[in-house]
């Protein structure tokens, strides 16, 4: 197929109606950015062929370190405060993204014998970077593992008062996710976990989610979590209103700090 990137989409005609099929599914308009792509020279790694893969949603897997659990009222997220769930048999809420069961990377480490006994070859980790949700697809800091699933070595009091939705008052959350000691300790734990997985002959796939983030992200800092913390630049929210920078299209202004 040559050395060039191949882009394609399907154009479907039925009478006077024309529609298109691309990465967004079926639509009535064509956009170049949603075309399918084939990368030349791509080959499936040999170790992946026939491998047994085990996907881990970290918060719901195993609580190996209760000291890093998200607390009820630690911060405000999508209309309400965070909730710590003690009963693992509880049915998740409809809006369960702010409910935390306490699973963490230490819990994954503790269960490696179990995973190996199952015959697992590859561990696929759902997102693990700093994020206010339990699924962590709305990344807050791509440089660091979330201390709530990593290690918290520096902590403080400071839960939100009842009725308070201002996360600049969420002192406990701010300390946990901005203190470099917590972030570095969490990165170190992740490194130790990956090294141990590799030592056992298994592989790791990380769901990086590098194509989108959330408004908690330090680049924007809508929640004013980073604005007064040492070592962080002012987020974009500090410099202009939220208009169009959540979706970056060709020709839009760069999201540079």
Predicted regions and their residues:
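Substrate-binding/active-site clefts of carbohydrate-active enzymes
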Residues: 58-121, 128-257
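The feature marks proteins involved in alpha-glucan
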Residues: 1-55, 63-80, 87
């Amino acid at each position: 197929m040559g050395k060039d990137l191949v882009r394609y989409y399907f154009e479907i005609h039925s009478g006077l109606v024309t529609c298109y099929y691309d990465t967004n599914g079926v639509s009535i308009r064509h956009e170049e950015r949603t075309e399918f792509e084939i990368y030349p020279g791509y080959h499936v790694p040999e170790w992946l062929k026939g491998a047994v893969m085990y996907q881990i949603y970290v918060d719901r897997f195993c609580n190996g370190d209760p000291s890093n659990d998200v607390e009820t009222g630690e911060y405000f997220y999508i209309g309400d405060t965070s909730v710590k769930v003690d009963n693992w048999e509880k049915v998740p809420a409809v809006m369960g993204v702010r409910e935390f069961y306490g699973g963490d990377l230490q819990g994954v480490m503790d269960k490696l014998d179990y995973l190996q006994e199952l015959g697992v070859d590859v561990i696929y980790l759902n997102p693990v970077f700093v994020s206010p949700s339990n699924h962590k697809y709305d990344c807050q800091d791509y440089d660091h593992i979330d201390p709530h699933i990593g290690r918290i070595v520096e902590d403080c009091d400071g839960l939100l008062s009842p009725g308070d939705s201002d996360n600049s008052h969420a002192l406990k959350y701010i300390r946990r996710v901005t203190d470099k000691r917590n972030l570095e300790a969490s990165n170190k734990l992740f490194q130790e976990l990956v090294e141990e997985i590799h030592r056992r002959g298994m592989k790791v796939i990380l769901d990086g989610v590098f194509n989108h983030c959330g408004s908690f992200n330090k680049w924007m800092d809508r929640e004013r979590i980073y604005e007064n913390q040492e070592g962080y630049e002012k987020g974009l929210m500090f410099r202009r209103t939220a208009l169009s920078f959540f979706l970056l299209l060709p020709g839009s202004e760069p999201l540079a700090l």
